[in-house]
Amino acid sequence: MWTTVMQAFPRHTINRAVIVLLPKQPALDWIKSIDPSPANLTLGELRQEPDAFLVRDERMEFPEDAERWVHRRWKMFFEMFIADWYIDESLWPQKRTLKMFKDWFEIQYHPMVWDLSDGPIVNEDWD
C-alpha cells in the first residue's frame, strides 16, 4: 500500500530545512495590549499559521544547531513578526532582547522537506 501511495505523487526532498517560529503567550499578550480588537484571538489561533523559513540544511544537523542559528538572527525574526501585526514602530516593544525573543517564540526545526508537487518552485521578491 505504501508503494502505491508514494507512486501517486512525485517524491523528492529539497536541500533545505524548515524553521518555524511559534508564538507563545507573551506575543499574544503584546498583540492584545496594543489593539484590543482581536479580543477573542487565542494562542491556538495565533499559532495556526506561523511563518516558516527555508534554510540551508547542511549547517544544521540537530535542533540545537537551528536554535543557535535563529538566536544569531533574533532581531530580524522578532521585527518581522511585530511588523506583520503593526507597522507603526512606536507601538513595538522598545527594549527587545534575546531573552524576550526566547520568551515570545518556540523554535521548531524540521530537517526533512519533501516536495510532493510536480510544479516549479517560484520565488517571490518582497523588496
Can you name each region flagged by the protein language model?
Residues 2-60, 65:
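Extended, charge-biased low-complexity segments
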Residues 9-11, 44-45, 90-93, 125-126:
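A general structural signal for short secondary-structure junctions and capping/turn motifs
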Residues 30-31, 124-126:
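Short, solvent-exposed polar/charged micro-motifs at secondary-structure junctions
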Residues 56-124:
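Amphipathic protein-protein interaction modules
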